[in-house]
Amino acid sequence: MLPDAVKKAGYLTVASDVPYPPFEFYDTDGKTILGSDPDIAKALGELMGIQFRLQPVAQVNIIPGLSSGKYDLGLSGMADRKEREAAVTFVDYMRNAGTFLVTADAKHHPMTLPDICGLNVAVQSATTMADDATGQATKCTADGKQAPKVMEFQSQDDAVLALRSNRADVAMVTAGSGAFIMTQAKGQFDMTATYSAGSILGIPVRKDNMQLAKALEAGVQKLIDNGTYKKILTKWGLDKLNSIEKSGINGAIS
């Protein structure tokens, strides 16, 4: 099902927002990329008989890089959203929800988006969480409340660092990431609540490359059906919060 050019080349160039644990992050050597997305890429490569070559790319640069032809696809826990579907085609492969991460001794414990009014909020740029925070800032002002100070960072690690260093009252991250961060931080953080019903996560490809999208959709579904997908997500603590039963194309909820 792969395009002939991909078969001939023997590889696909994959943009991935490293670090974004547990989806992708560096091992202790600072070079090897670990996580659920690299494992999925490896499994897809073995299934298709080609290499998936991951390249670290900031989230904000993934879609522009795809559109320019610099990368063949993105694999980075990216939300499939209607507005993004105007620029790329998504192959849906997971789901996720937003959550609030606070320090264990936090004074504020937001449970819903209106609870962030007046707080210092750390988010990663170009993410659904960043959009949610800035959108809520407008609503806070409209309701006569103090808007949150939204602090945007290039990486999720930097947003969490702002929380750890008390520059932020709360960090807004995905539920899968929040759960992983808590296991690694050993009591430093708490997740107060998931604040959204969740979104579909997709593998973006160029709009004009539907043949590749169809091949990836079939590949993801094969991994789901043969149990490889469940093993990978379970390994990274994502099975309960992030798994789906059926892949698809452009399945954005909003």
What are these language model-derived features?
Residues 42, 51-115:
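Acidic, polar ligand-binding/catalytic clefts
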Residues 53-64, 108-109, 147-161, 199:
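Short helix-initiation/N-cap motifs at beta->coil->alpha
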Residues 1, 128-145, 191, 221-254:
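Ligand-binding clefts/hinges and TM-proximal coupling segments of bilobed small-molecule sensing domains
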Residues 78-85, 134-136, 164-197:
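A ligand-binding cleft/hinge motif common to bilobed small-molecule-binding domains
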Residues 38-39, 46, 106, 114, ...:
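Extended ligand-binding regions for polar small-molecule ligands
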Residues 21, 33-46, 78, 97-155, ...:
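Bilobed "Venus flytrap"/periplasmic-binding protein-like clamshell domains
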Residues 1-74, 226:
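Extracytoplasmic small-molecule ligand-binding "clamshell" domains
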Residues 95-102, 183-217, 221, 238-254:
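Periplasmic-binding protein-like
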